[in-house]
């Protein structure tokens, strides 16, 4: 089995990249794909760049060139569900766009034509992620992760997203685009993100301060998953 891993920023993939043996590097547009082995497992690690378009370009290149059997999206997210704190893990059962609106033509909020309203994560991958998080003693929640091309940093923005998607756990800028590409290629995926901020007025300062912690937490969980996948 070859495991695909996607992170947007260098900080989000650095730990995993540095653990890779026999590492090679391929650049496609703004994306970088690192291939090698971690703990004897074949890994294709994508640093996609930030935002939905960069994520889609990179994930398409990853799936076409490296041909992984599954994809794990790792990194950080803003926590908007009650009880979430910095360092906690959110695992996707589904992902949706919070900034897509074709409701004028009868689609659900967040749904794009010719696509489902929600992209469902692979249950086995999500179950494994939860099992590993609990085994590592990490605080974890599962549910809806919403994506959009905005860094959410105000209570008003959170309130609007929660009004449209009451069950949202976390918000970020790539996961649903990655999920859409995986859906199109029929490749199972899951999103595993660590909370770096609360999406409120202090989000930008919190993000800068706690991104290293979020990267460490999410990378530790992904490493646990790698050891179990075969």
From Swiss-Prot:
Positions of the catalytic residues: 12, 197
One of the record's GO cellular component terms: cytosol
Key words of the record: Amino-acid biosynthesis, Hydrolase, Methionine biosynthesis
Pathway of action: Amino-acid biosynthesis; L-methionine biosynthesis via salvage pathway; S-methyl-5-thio-alpha-D-ribose 1-phosphate from S-methyl-5'-thioadenosine (hydrolase route): step 1/2
Swiss-Prot/TrEMBL GO biological process terms: L-methionine salvage from methylthioadenosine; L-methionine salvage from S-adenosylmethionine; nucleoside catabolic process
Catalytic reactions of this protein: S-adenosyl-L-homocysteine + H2O = S-(5-deoxy-D-ribos-5-yl)-L-homocysteine + adenine; S-methyl-5'-thioadenosine + H2O = 5-(methylsulfanyl)-D-ribose + adenine; 5'-deoxyadenosine + H2O = 5-deoxy-D-ribose + adenine
MF terms in GO: adenosylhomocysteine nucleosidase activity; methylthioadenosine nucleosidase activity
Entries under CDD domains matching the protein: MTAN
Pfam family, one: PNP_UDP_1
InterPro entries registered for this protein in UniProt: MTA_SAH_Nsdase (IPR010049), Nucleoside_phosphorylase_d (IPR000845), Nucleoside_phosphorylase_sf (IPR035994)
Chain sites annotated for binding substrate: 78, 152, 173-174
This protein's record includes keyword Ligase: no
E.C. designation(s): 3.2.2.9
Chain's role: Catalyzes the irreversible cleavage of the glycosidic bond in both 5'-methylthioadenosine (MTA) and S-adenosylhomocysteine (SAH/AdoHcy) to adenine and the corresponding thioribose, 5'-methylthioribose and S-ribosylhomocysteine, respectively. Also cleaves 5'-deoxyadenosine, a toxic by-product of radical S-adenosylmethionine (SAM) enzymes, into 5-deoxyribose and adenine.
HAMAP family: Salvage_MtnN
Family listed: Belongs to the PNP/UDP phosphorylase family. MtnN subfamily.
Name of the featured protein: 5'-methylthioadenosine/S-adenosylhomocysteine nucleosidase
Originating species: Haemophilus influenzae (strain 86-028NP)
């Amino acid at each position: 089995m070859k495991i695909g891993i996607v992170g947007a920023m260098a900080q989000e993939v650095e730990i995993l990249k540095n653990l890779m043996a026999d590492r090679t590097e391929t650049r496609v547009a703004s994306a970088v794909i690192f291939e090698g082995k971690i703990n004897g497992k074949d890994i294709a690690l994508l640093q996609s760049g930030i935002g939905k378009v960069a994520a889609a370009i990179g994930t398409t290149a990853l799936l076409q060139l490296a041909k992984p059997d599954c994809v794990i999206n790792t990194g950080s997210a803003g926590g908007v569900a009650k009880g979430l704190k910095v360092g906690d893990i959110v695992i996707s059962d589904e992902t949706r766009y919070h900034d897509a609106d074709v409701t004028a033509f009868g689609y659900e909020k967040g749904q794009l034509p010719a696509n489902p309203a929600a992209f469902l994560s692979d249950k086995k991958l999500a179950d494994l992620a939860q099992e590993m998080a609990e085994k590592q003693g990490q605080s974890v929640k599962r549910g809806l992760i919403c994506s959009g091309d905005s860094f959410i940093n105000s209570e008003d923005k959170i309130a609007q997203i929660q009004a449209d998607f009451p069950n949202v756990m976390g918000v970020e800028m790539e996961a649903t685009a990655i999920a859409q590409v995986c859906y199109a290629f029929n490749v199972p995926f899951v999103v595993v993100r660590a909370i770096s901020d609360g999406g409120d007025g202090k989000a930008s300062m919190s993000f800068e301060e706690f991104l290293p912690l979020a990267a460490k937490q999410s990378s530790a969980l992904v490493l646990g998953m790698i050891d179990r996948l075969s």
